[in-house]
Every structure is written in structure tokens, then in C-alpha cells.
Amino acid sequence: DEECFDIPSNHQDYGKKIAAYYWWIFPNLMLNFYPWGLSINVVLPQGISLTKIAYYGLILDKSKLGLGAGGDLDTVEDEDQWIVESCDKGMNSPLYQRGRYSPSMEQGVHHFHRLITE
């Protein structure tokens, strides 16, 4: 059974199994709430083609650390970083041809780019 939040009866998510809440605060802050605590990701542009992500963790309940969503957070963040670096390498390849956004796969990227242009 996955570790989930104990949600009060007067909350809109009462009765649901919620393992994590994710908030993105434009443009570069992500707050990831888990039953064990909070993971903070800060995206720090270092130049036109270089970005650093600073990860911070605040453990509120050590007994839940390592369980459920966010339980193996270091591994997941390493995998995410590898995927982003691989995509970047492919997009910088001479064979890559930029095209339209994929409506089924790139809604988040499209939304982010629209926010940047506003």
C-alpha cells in the first residue's frame, strides 16, 4: 500500500489517495510535497544553453522517508536529468528539424513557452 496524505474530511481531496502534491511557481521554482516532507527544485539559468537545478529537501517525518511517491527521489531526479540532457543533445543535432508541438505529448512545454512570451 502506497504512503498517502491523511486528508481532512472538509478538504476537496478527501477520500482520494493522494501520494504527492506538485506546485510550479513561475518561472523557476517547483515545490513537491510528499507525506515525508518537501522537495524544492530551483532552476538556475547559467547561460543561453546551460542550466543548473538546485535540489533541497526538508524531511518532516523520517518514518515515512523512502516510502511511496518521492521515496527514491535522488534516483528519479538523476533519471530526469539524464533524459533532459539526452533530449537536449538530440535537439542540438544537425539532423533535428524543429516542428509544431505535439498536442498529446508536449502540453507542458507549450504552456511554459506561452508564459515566457507573455
Model-derived regions, located:
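C-terminal catalytic domain of Rieske-type non-heme iron oxygenases
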Residues: 1-118
